[in-house]
Curated annotation (Swiss-Prot):
Record-level GO cellular component terms: endoplasmic reticulum; membrane; nuclear inner membrane; plasma membrane
Keyword terms, alphabetized: Cell membrane, Endoplasmic reticulum, Membrane, Nucleus, Transmembrane, Transmembrane helix
This protein's encoding gene: tmem120a.L
Entry's transmembrane regions: 132-151, 158-176, 190-208, 218-239, 270-293, 304-329
Chief site of localization: membrane
Protein name: Transmembrane protein 120A
Quaternary structure note: Homodimer.
Residues engaged in binding CoA: 129, 186-187, 236, 239-240, 331
Amino acid sequence: MNSPVLQDCVREWGEIQENYQDIQETHRLYKQKLEELSKLQTRCSGTISRQKKKLRELSVELKKCKSKAKNVEEEEEQIRDLNNQIRAREKTFFEMESFLPKKNGLYLSLVLGNVNVTLLSKQAKFAYKDEYEKFKLYLTIILMVLSFICRFLLNSRVTDAVFNFLLVWYYCTLTIRESILINNGSRIKGWWVLNHYISTFLSGVMLTWPDGLMYQMFRNQFLSFSMYQSFVQFLQYYYQSGCLYRLRALGERHNMDLTVEGFQSWMWRGLTFLLPFLFFGQFWQLYNAITLFKLARHPECKEWQVIMCGLPFLVHFLGNFFTTLRVVHQKFQKQN
């Protein structure tokens, strides 16, 4: 005669078997829906591609018509109306494509391979974007504290190397995450993405710079700049995130828009006070470049890292300064 414990085990196994049948059926339906989803994605992507091609061809034809329709007011109005509708349709397709699998760019392909990084729901996209923003905030605070410690408390090449390694890892991670966000519909301006690639290169060169006279002559200036840069980035995140939240609530900004380390047109509403901080930081980048170019001409300078750090600082200044200046100029033009 079976023991009560064994009988309980047999009964439990029977219940597990019943649940297992349900799981198998649910999983079968899940795989079926996945196959259907894959077919729908392929069909939708193909249809959108064909429509976009036709829109491009139509835009070319409209340009030809515009050159022939000079001084014919009715035709010019029709052409303007069609162009506006084409632009609106292209924006709609952009929204649609953010929910469809797409081929990774060169950078993501090199880092991740041919992995689909498209998130299929608005909630997942927003959660990933929110996590990206928190990552930037937390690392900015950590970098600010660490640069303060290196600048005022510990004068050691080891702690400096830890700080520079953290910078390399931070900017590498940012570029990967931003590429994924772009694949999911974030409209990050070209310069602000390139800016992080340059920062990754600069941090990598700083990491390899051996201790010596040239390094010590630039060390305190670099750490002070890093501390100030982290402080400004913290200010930008704090105020930009609040501004973006209000504009999204008003329907004036896209849900996937991000905070940036610069100034964009939407920031005129309450964020112009950041401009002096930004311009000061940008001219500090120029000052860093000039300092490094002077050090490169020093009789005792033998390190290649000196000139290779000076060039990225100069590119940073030119890109940041003229991008910010263009936004300010465009805003004043619109006001006039």
